[in-house]
Amino acid sequence: MVNSRETLDLTTFVGPAGNAVDWRISDSRVDYAAALAFMEARAAAIAAGEAPELVWLLEHPPVYTSGTSGKPEDLRDPRFPLVPTGRGGQVTYHGPGQRVAYVMLDLKRRRPDVRAYVAALEEMIIRTLDAFNVRGERREDRVGVWVRRPDKGEGYEDKIAAIGVRLKRWVSFHGIAINVEPDLTHFQAIVPCGVTDPRYGVTSLVDLGLPVTLTDVDLALRQAFESVFGATRASLPETA
């Protein structure tokens, strides 16, 4: 069965000519609340034409976040703080070893279509994983990017990257999280993204046997982003 998001034309997400997106990497871990406040302010500035679009790569200290569809019972073991957010989706974990990319784009200037935008983010992740010979796949009923796990049994799949977005005045924020080498046991304390089927778990690049670093992923992610959304330019970090 063809995933309907696979049939969407994603070429219209390339920005206007000469419009390079700021590309920023934070080397130290960023508190989630501080990152959220920064994104809110930056998205408002982009909408007002006062700041360029931005992709911000970072790691968080261990934290659970809950989207607009999150339920209290999704947190089984409150070993870390749970922060409510306005993004779509349910409960997920962020922490060291996970590459978070917050994508702040003016979709009004690109393509004001939330469903197609999510598909474009999935495509960016799939192309990133392809650089490491990992086949990431979409699923019609599960947002994010998945890998098949025949080693675990027939029909088993693991999520390797999560997506959660929010838009204000057609400017996106929040974004994606790719599991590079996080502590996967922390996902056991939640119902990740509301998925309860025991055949569907969580994995990472290192869990799949690949000695990949965050820097490796950053390089592949930037190339994948540019192939879907257009040019980037290096941006110096700011205090969030």
Curated annotation (Swiss-Prot):
Pathway(s) served: Protein modification; protein lipoylation via endogenous pathway; protein N(6)-(lipoyl)lysine from octanoyl-[acyl-carrier-protein]: step 1/2
Enzyme class: transferase
Residue stretches making up the BPL/LPL catalytic domain: 49-233
Protein location: Cytoplasm
Site (Lowers pKa of active site Cys): 159
Reaction catalysis annotation: octanoyl-[ACP] + L-lysyl-[protein] = N(6)-octanoyl-L-lysyl-[protein] + holo-[ACP] + H(+)
Catalytic residue positions: 193
Keywords: Acyltransferase, Cytoplasm, Transferase
Protein EC: 2.3.1.181
HAMAP family for the chain: LipB
Task of the protein: Catalyzes the transfer of endogenously produced octanoic acid from octanoyl-acyl-carrier-protein onto the lipoyl domains of lipoate-dependent enzymes. Lipoyl-ACP can also act as a substrate although octanoyl-ACP is likely to be the physiological substrate.
Further remark: In the reaction, the free carboxyl group of octanoic acid is attached via an amide linkage to the epsilon-amino group of a specific lysine residue of lipoyl domains of lipoate-dependent enzymes.
Protein name: Octanoyltransferase
Organism: Bradyrhizobium sp. (strain BTAi1 / ATCC BAA-1182)
